[in-house]
Amino acid sequence: MQPLLSVNDLSIGFGKNPPIVERLNFTVHAGETLALVGESGSGKTLSCRSILRILPSTAQIRSGQILLNNRGNSLDLAKLSERQLRDVRGDRVTMIFQEPMSSLSPLHRIGDQVSEVLKLHRDCSQSIAKRQVLKEFEYVGFNDPERTYNAYPFELSGGMQQRAMIAMATVAKPELLIADEPTTALDMTTQAQVLGLLKKLQAESGMALILITHDLGVVANMADQVVVMNRGRVMESGASELVLGSPAHPYTKKLFKAVPVISDSIQPALRQDTADIILSLRDVSKTYAIRQGNALSPNYSIQAVNAVDLDVPRGKVVAIVGESGSGKSTCARIALGAESSDHPGQVFFKESPGTDAIEVQSLDPSRRADFQRKAQMVFQDPHSSLSPRMQIIDTLTEPLDIHNIGTLAERRDRAIELLEQVGLNPSMLRRYPHAFSGGQRQRLSIARALALRPQLLVCDEPTSALDVSVQAQVLDLLEDIRDRLQLSYLFISHDLAVVARIADEVAVMRRGRIVEQAPPEVLLANPKHPYTQALIAAHPKPDIHRPIDLDTVALGAGEPDTWPDAFRYTVGNAPPLKEIDTNHLVRTHA
């Protein structure tokens, strides 16, 4: 059978430089899923953008063919005019981009943006287009299609924005859908639901799917064929059973080795030593007042955090796990004193064993500055947390300058020491952030957090923006400096596999409350709460024989008033956290 799409000897370059993508070959048949796998910079996105000829202005297709089956004849997309391409883009071949918020116009309603596809390619009226769009919205899982049609992008969550992008890409019933990292920015349960939706759409429409991803777990759940890329070249390709089951190339093996996994084995939990607690949150809550845009509408409030109690033992890693909006980052900011807790919440910090704990919320400015030297934060996105206008030496010495620590020579020596601590060369001091890779920038963020010799690091999703192998390197670094410098971590994440590797204790949050808490070897092997079970079930494993359990995900990912009776609650009647076993707490009525 003739393939729907054939890419033959494709090479892409910028200007007169050597090619970025070199001699790429793959085919996709109708109804088939091909996964392009690789780390950032491997050329997978550039390759797929070339199919639709939406490359950057300085990039050129140097050689090769991109053949689309046109009723038995081959149409070379690389040679079509711009006018001819308009009949292909958005109609026969469509694309879902990685960041839905940057792909959707903030100035236009969702429904109008999706309707535009039908007006361009089906020449239909506004009323017919709206009817078809509402039907598509219902199909992709919107509970209220009419409301979604009239909404602006900022009014939708990340998962809902991605569903809107899927609706836009599929409303014209394309033959080929290209999905560029469609779940990278999403939480685990939302990711599982989006992957399930793509499989459903594909099964019912027969469209082909090219999936661009760096996640081998996603590949195992979706792909029929796999192409592994590195630095613009194909390292390995073949059926997913072969590539995932017995990878042959060293690079593919390296990717597999770096994948964090959740163990199935249950180990008995030991009673934690609670004598030396460096950080303690007691009855911490946070309510935000939301102003309505319409002056006639009443304001309302959102409780982001609700009565959280949490201890971080000295020298240990305590992780808070949950989806976006669960309250975990708000807890982190309150722990550092960047936000205040609602009354009567308190945050206690003990500088050393045997000393009295200080209450962070009530510190005066001078004592707060002293506390901030001892508790620092590593942020999620190293790109936005490092000033593009400052050389690295200035970035690393700025905290020392603010706190009037050391002479200029001593600060420079400290900057060199910090680079060496995080595995970077001191010769990089005069570079700017843009000269570093994502993993190197995160190392720089960690180095800056260490500048004041803190005792506590709050790490807010420090690996979520990184490729899997770079993620493993950053986790290695965090473990190394924890042991060498005797640090304590409050670690924020949505990825249970990452947490399983680094944490001594895990607290799972949902809608502002801790619903389950235990050491990772207990929590991940023997979860009791339906939400914890959903998070674990939603984690894609790089094993084609262990697909995502969408039923378990749907059960636990719902609202608290839809959970099983033992765990169900509404706003005012949440059950308490109960110790059901040694160091294993569950919020349950039972």
Label each region the model flagged.
Residues A151-L156, M160, Y432-F436, Q440:
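Conserved ABC ATPase signature
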Residues V114, I166-A167, T190, V194, ...:
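Hydrophobic anchor residue at the start of the ABC signature
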Residues V171-E175, A451-Q455:
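A short, proline-enriched helix->beta-strand linker immediately N-terminal to the Walker B motif
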Residues V234-G238, S246, I514-A518:
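ABC ATPase "signature
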Residues Q65-D87, S125, G196, Q346-D370, ...:
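ABC ATPase NBD Q-loop/coupling interface
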Residues I128-R147, S352-T355, E410-S427:
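Conserved ABC ATPase "signature" region
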Residues Q2-P3, S74, N143-N150, S240-S301, ...:
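Short catalytic/signature loops enriched in Gly
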